[in-house]
């Protein structure tokens, strides 16, 4: 009888613990209002975090460096950011780990003034990027290298969010800037040409949208991490394949009311998101190579396992989650 009572008590305690975890508010950061932020938005708006028993709040933290700092400081539990600052921080011993990725390509296009018609015209010009140390800088450095343009011959300016850069470009304050849908469509309607798409670079693989968390949080809260990745994977797939669900999400989060712009943005990103949401190792190697070039005095550990841990994704794949989500089971 005593054993039965103990068993019942254990069940109650376990249920209470699960409920506490379900009710704990998890803060999830995203990096801006570009269309490539959609997987985090979809997980929230489609009720998938709730479906998997998570109470989440999304917070916007622009730039990978700030997003990384928020994770390190415990201000957020998960971050949807690009991998550059994460790799640099982890290499220096930060308690962080990348657990998933929904976008493994640069989503940007280089939009320019009308007098710039070829890459060589960028020499001596001002190019706006969101900030140094992230995907914008990496993609521009790669593009200049591919075009045989010396890095020092082009001025890169940290110019803030896309809306700021768009205004600066349209008013002549910048000669060029990197934009993603929906701003690329708006620029085209203003007659500003696109010089190049970063997805067309020879070295286009890049950890653009990764999910990171503290390694210690992952070890202590594996069940939460698993349920988070279940929601994130399902959100990514639903967004990619269900336009009727996806368009209202863009309408809400991008503050964009032009139906044509919203649809253009959806068509662009639905085709390049990654499902299953795994990290491209080629992209990681490229990011590490660029970090090493930018900081030659830093000894960089090139073992991808130091930065990426997809064991929970492996478990979900063995359990058939991705097949069930995509209807292939």
Where are these regions (language model features)?
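Secondary-structure end/capping motifs
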Residues: 219-300
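Pocket-lining segment of extracytoplasmic ligand-binding domains
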Residues: 84-85, 163-256
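Conserved C-terminal helix/tail region of periplasmic/extracytoplasmic solute-binding proteins
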Residues: 292-329
């Amino acid at each position: 009888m005593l054993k039965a009572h103990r068993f019942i008590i254990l069940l109650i305690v376990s249920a209470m613990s699960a409920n506490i975890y379900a009710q704990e508010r998890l803060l999830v950061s995203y990096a801006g209002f570009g269309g490539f932020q959609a997987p985090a938005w979809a997980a929230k708006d489609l009720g998938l975090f709730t479906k998997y028993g998570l109470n989440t709040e999304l917070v916007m933290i622009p730039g990978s460096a700030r997003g990384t700092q928020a994770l390190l400081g415990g201000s957020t539990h998960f971050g949807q950011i690009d991998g550059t600052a994460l790799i640099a921080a982890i290499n220096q011993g930060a308690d962080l780990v990348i657990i998933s990725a929904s976008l493994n390509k640069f989503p940007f296009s280089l939009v320019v003034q009308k007098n710039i018609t070829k890459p060589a015209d960028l020499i001596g010009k001002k190019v706006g990027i969101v900030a140094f140390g992230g995907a914008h800088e990496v993609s521009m450095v790669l593009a200049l290298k591919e075009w045989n343009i010396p890095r020092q011959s082009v001025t890169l300016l940290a110019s803030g969010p896309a809306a700021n850069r768009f205004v600066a470009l349209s008013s002549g304050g910048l000669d060029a800037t990197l934009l993603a849908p929906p701003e690329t469509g708006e620029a085209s309607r203003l007659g500003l040409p696109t010089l190049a798409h970063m997805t067309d670079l020879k070295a286009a693989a890049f950890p653009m949208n990764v999910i990171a968390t503290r390694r210690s949080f992952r070890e202590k809260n594996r069940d939460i991490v698993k349920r988070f990745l279940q929601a994130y994977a399902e959100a990514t797939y639903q967004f990619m394949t269900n336009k009727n669900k996806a368009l209202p999400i863009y309408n809400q989060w991008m503050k964009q009311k032009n139906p044509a712009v919203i649809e253009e943005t959806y068509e662009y990103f639905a085709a390049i998101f990654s499902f299953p949401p795994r990290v491209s190792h080629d992209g990681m190697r490229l990011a590490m190579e660029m970090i090493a070039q930018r900081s030659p005095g830093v000894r960089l550990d090139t073992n991808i396992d130091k930065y990426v841990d997809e064991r929970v994704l492996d478990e979900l794949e063995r359990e058939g989650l991705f097949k069930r989500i995509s209807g292939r089971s």
